[in-house]
């Protein structure tokens, strides 16, 4: 998994301070680790968007102005329901020897049988929550859809994990992850109306 550096600034919590920051392109955030005090920070919105909307997960080195760096990953992101802008982010610290739960983006591989028959592949669940050691975490998770037919889905319980023995999928086993939807039927041509000459 790629390591990305991201600058952060310490933030003092004041009334209406978060709203003022957002107007200047700065996103309020917190950094936390089990058993430690939560740290309030702010981060550049543009830099954060590149990470949040990436097709891959990243390990993030958060860099403070005093030179201190802490290793983390994005645990939660809140969006404005109207503008869809990022309004708050949670970063979780971790050490190399502890189990973590991380959301990893889903991708597909293979030429699905259903697609060859005219269907369209649709990812229903765009990220899987994986539990394991940080070193075992992939930047994305590919699901083989080669044998997937139209109208069929691959559920969490059907995803083979033999190649990733150190990882466990934490999502509900019955959750559909990817499916093949049937092609849309073309609209039937309107019946011609006979017009009699008068």
UniProtKB/Swiss-Prot annotation:
Entry keyword set: Ribonucleoprotein, Ribosomal protein, RNA-binding, rRNA-binding
Functional note: This is one of the proteins that binds to the 5S RNA in the ribosome where it forms part of the central protuberance.
Source organism of this protein record: Chlorobium phaeobacteroides (strain DSM 266 / SMG 266 / 2430)
Cellular-component GO terms for this entry: cytosolic large ribosomal subunit
Residues passing through the membrane, by range: none
Protein name (Swiss-Prot/TrEMBL): Large ribosomal subunit protein bL25
HAMAP family xrefs: Ribosomal_bL25_CTC (MF_01334)
A Gene Ontology BP annotation from the UniProt entry: translation
Disulphide bridges, residue numbers: none
One example GO MF annotation: structural constituent of ribosome
Matching NCBIfam families: bL25_bact_ctc (TIGR00731), PRK05618.3-2 (NF004136)
UniProt xrefs under SUPFAM superfamilies: Ribosomal protein L25-like (SSF50715)
Family membership: Belongs to the bacterial ribosomal protein bL25 family. CTC subfamily.
Cross-referenced PANTHER family: RIBOSOMAL PROTEIN L25/GLN-TRNA SYNTHETASE, ANTI-CODON-BINDING DOMAIN-CONTAINING PROTEIN, RIBOSOMAL PROTEIN L25_GLN-TRNA SYNTHETASE, ANTI-CODON-BINDING DOMAIN-CONTAINING PROTEIN
Subunit-structure text: Part of the 50S ribosomal subunit; part of the 5S rRNA/L5/L18/L25 subcomplex. Contacts the 5S rRNA. Binds to the 5S rRNA independently of L5 and L18.
One Pfam family cited in the UniProt record for this chain: Ribosomal_L25p
């Amino acid at each position: 998994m790629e390591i990305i550096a991201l600058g952060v600034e310490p933030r003092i919590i004041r009334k209406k301070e978060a709203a003022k920051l957002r107007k200047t392109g700065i996103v309020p955030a917190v950094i936390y680790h089990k058993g430690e005090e939560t740290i309030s920070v702010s981060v550049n919105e543009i830099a954060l968007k590149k990470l949040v909307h990436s097709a891959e997960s990243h390990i993030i080195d958060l860099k403070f102005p005093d030179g201190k760096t802490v290793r983390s990953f994005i645990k939660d992101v809140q969006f404005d329901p109207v503008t869809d802008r990022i309004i708050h982010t949670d970063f979780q610290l971790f050490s190399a020897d502890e189990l973590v739960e991380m959301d990893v983006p889903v991708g597909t591989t293979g030429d699905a049988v259903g697609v060859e028959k005219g269907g369209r592949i649709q990812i229903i669940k765009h990220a899987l929550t994986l539990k394991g050691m940080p070193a075992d975490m992939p930047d994305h998770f590919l699901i083989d859809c080669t044998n997937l037919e139209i109208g069929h889905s691959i559920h969490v319980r059907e995803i083979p994990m033999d190649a990733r023995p150190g990882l466990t999928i934490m999502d509900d086993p019955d959750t559909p992850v990817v499916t093949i939807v049937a092609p849309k039927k073309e609209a039937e041509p309107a019946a011609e109306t006979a017009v009699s000459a008068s």
